[in-house]
Amino acid sequence: MSRYLVTGGAGFIGTNLVKQLVAEGHEVIVLDNYTSGKKPERVISGVTYVEGDIRNDADLDRVCPGVDGIFHLAALPRVPFSVENPELTHDVNVNGTLQVLLAARKHAIKRVVFSSSSSAYGGQAEKLLVEDTAIKKPISPYALHKFIGENYCRIFASLYGIETVSLIYFNIYGPYFDPDGAYALVIGKFLKQMKNNEPMTVCGDGENYRDYTHVSDVVRANILAMTSEKVGKGELINIGCGEPHTVNELVKIIGGKSVFVPERPGDVRFSGADNTKARELLGWEPTIALEEGIQQLKKEMGLVLKVRHLTQRI
């Protein structure tokens, strides 16, 4: 059994990760200020919840002693929110990540697994992005924050001997996602609109490609990244299915009416994962196809319409 700290452990991905860590018998501490996460109404038995801020040294000193590894998920997410609030999101996402790495060094914590984002790639012509060859060109503050975080992790591994791994997530969905709010993820937003008998609002022309990845696959990648002997030197590893779909195709899979609305600033055209590195270094591969994951969510939300399967794959 290991003792893990999960920053942002009350959020969407964090809650799923914490549940799995507990199921595997690990001791878990959650540090969260509940800005994006939920105060622990969804308390997981056996987990220590600490309300605090990753930018605060004293809060980190409360939770880091005796920890074997840190899953660093805490952030102010979403591209549009960062466009509207660049200073605040920089402070949390960049300075907060630096403070977590400094705390890991101070408390001699062996490994940090950092949650990055495919948005850090920026605008790319390729539909499947390769970690070590794509030249990253962030086009939003949030994307830049994650790019900086990746580089801080690499530097801390090389200069200070802190084992780090950066997992690059591609459009995650699944249980505990939040369908509410102006910055809700597209699948959650669409399913909520369907439940309310509203048309799905598609930004731009709907031909942006996204690589939708189920949160259970992301959780598995995190645990593998924490335990694999093949990583720890600041590696960048894509975590995505490798089968990008357009937003218009997503609408067809969900089923229902849609309307087009203006494109959002900061959105990239193509976002898909070449996951070869994850397979080779982590022994990871995706297990839940988009159609299956959508069907599961629709059942959870009481939506009985059946998934429509695509006739053409990308």
Locate each region found by the language model.
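Generic anion/oxyanion-binding catalytic loop in active/binding sites
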Residues: 49, 71, 78, 86, ...
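Glycine-rich phosphate-binding loop at the start of an alpha helix
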Residues: 76, 80-83, 143, 184-187, ...
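NAD(P)-dependent short-chain dehydrogenase/reductase
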Residues: 126-128, 151-210, 215-226, 242, ...
